[in-house]
């Protein structure tokens, strides 16, 4: 069985930090084609997106038209692994989630539901560290609304993660999602060894 774990949340909720923590120390192979992704041959996981210094990693680092490649790619019978990991806004859309289901994937959506004040502090710290401007609140509000709408529409696949520290988020995620548990514990998820 193929399983996908997609991490969503408003800007500054900790999506990139969480995914980087889940995959820390794994040997990595980066690819640009057919879609920007990282293959972790040991333990056998694909992470969609790219890592960039200063934030905006994951699927946010992909082309605006990434969905046109991602949709058929996850339905390809030659997909290199049975476990998929992704975070970010770019592919957090109904069309991609439906493509995963249509391709035979079990979908798990981890919603990082942190207080807006904490997310704002993190965004400010990220902007200061990168020497960039703070994201406009109207844009952040739009992203927050998009996430809330997505979570509402896909509620049967959503696991709410409400803790604030990365370590507690991982613990809560492991408790709620068999895919996350497989990633963290190095267990087997229905035939896929990690």
Describe the residue ranges of each PLM region.
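Short mixed-charge
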Residues: 27-42
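A conserved segment at the C-terminal end of the G1
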Residues: 16-29
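Conserved phosphate-donor/acceptor-positioning beta-strand/loop module used by diverse small-molecule
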Residues: 87-88, 103-125
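NTP-dependent small-molecule kinase module
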Residues: 149-194
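Conserved nucleotide-sensing/catalytic segment adjacent to the nucleotide-binding pocket
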Residues: 38-90
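Conserved glycine(s) of the Walker
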Residues: 9-14
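Well-ordered, non-membrane alpha-helical segments in soluble/globular domains
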Residues: 63-75, 93-96, 133-148, 170-176
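Short hydrophobic/aromatic beta-strand immediately N-terminal to the Walker A/P-loop
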Residues: 4-8
């Amino acid at each position: 069985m193929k399983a996908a774990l997609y991490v969503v949340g408003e800007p500054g909720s900790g999506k990139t930090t969480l995914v980087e923590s889940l995959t820390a120390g794994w040997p990595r192979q980066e690819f640009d084609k057919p879609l920007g992704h990282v293959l972790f041959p040991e333990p056998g996981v694909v992470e969609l997106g790219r890592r960039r210094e200063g934030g905006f990693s994951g699927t946010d680092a992909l082309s605006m038209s990434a969905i046109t490649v991602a949709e058929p790619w996850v339905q390809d019978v030659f997909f290199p692994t049975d476990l998929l990991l992704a975070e970010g806004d770019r592919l957090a859309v109904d069309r991609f989630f439906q493509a995963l289901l249509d391709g035979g994937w079990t979908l798990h959506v981890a919603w990082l539901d942190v207080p807006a004040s904490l997310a704002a502090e993190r965004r400010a710290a990220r902007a200061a560290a990168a020497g960039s401007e703070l994201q406009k609140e109207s844009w952040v509000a739009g992203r927050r609304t998009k996430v809330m709408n997505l979570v509402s529409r896909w509620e049967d696949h959503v696991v709410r993660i409400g803790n604030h520290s990365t370590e507690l988020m991982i613990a809560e995620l492991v408790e709620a999602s068999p895919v996350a548990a497989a990633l963290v514990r190095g267990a087997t998820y229905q035939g896929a060894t990690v």
